[in-house]
């Protein structure tokens, strides 16, 4: 997605060998860009029968919400912290965050997923694939089907895509980062 790649080049900060800071996605969200991202995902998956979009809080919510709006289906986001209102029928998975270097237990209320659901997972970044893997575990535990994993930005130099594709989950990434070179992003051809 050229619009996204241009924004990454203009506003992205490469931190070290494998971290890209993008505040338009993770802090002060650019809703117009997120709306375009949502439309692209919706166009790609409009004929697949998607019934739900699933994301993990927090940065995955914005692109997932706009994909949900464009697909006209409900969105569910996995919570990273348990609260007292989620006290029964909870599906959980352990998820390691590459950026934060911590493991979180993410959860979704089981009543929101059924065996009839065809799910599109939407996430902001794909690095080692652990967030998507955790969501897949929860979705399949509910008996629902993962139709595809939609990624805003993929770090192609890490093994997340291979992990998901080896398990037969289609991955669609709007921007694919091949490497960082001299503090700059080098792109690989995106899926869309």
From Swiss-Prot:
Q: Where in the cell is it found?
A: Cytoplasm
> Residues that bind 5-phospho-alpha-D-ribose 1-diphosphate, according to the entry?
127-131
* Keyword Signal appears in the UniProt entry: no
> Keywords on this record?
Cytoplasm, Glycosyltransferase, Purine salvage, Transferase
EC assignment: the record states: 2.4.2.22
Q: Name one Pfam family in it.
A: Pribosyltran
Specify the enzyme's EC class, one word: transferase
Q: Name one GO molecular function term.
A: xanthine phosphoribosyltransferase activity
Q: Name one GO cellular component term.
A: cytoplasm
Q: Which pathway is this protein engaged in?
A: Purine metabolism; XMP biosynthesis via salvage pathway; XMP from xanthine: step 1/1
Q: Which InterPro entries does this one have?
A: PRibTrfase_dom, PRTase-like, Pur/Pyrimidine_PRTase, Xanthine_PRibTrfase
Single Gene Ontology BP annotation? purine ribonucleoside salvage
Check the record and name the CDD domains matching this protein: PRTases_typeI (cd06223)
The catalysed reaction is: XMP + diphosphate = xanthine + 5-phospho-alpha-D-ribose 1-diphosphate
Instruction: Locate the residues binding xanthine.
Output: 20, 26, 155
Spans traversing the lipid bilayer: none
Q: What does this protein do?
A: Converts the preformed base xanthine, a product of nucleic acid breakdown, to xanthosine 5'-monophosphate (XMP), so it can be reused for RNA or DNA synthesis.
Listed under subunit, the entry gives: Homodimer.
Describe the family membership recorded for this protein in Swiss-Prot or TrEMBL. Belongs to the purine/pyrimidine phosphoribosyltransferase family. Xpt subfamily.
User: Mind telling me which HAMAP family this protein's record contains?
Assistant: XPRTase
Q: What is this protein called?
A: Xanthine phosphoribosyltransferase
What is the scientific name of the source organism? Streptococcus thermophilus
Q: What is the lineage of its organism?
A: Bacteria, Bacillati, Bacillota, Bacilli, Lactobacillales
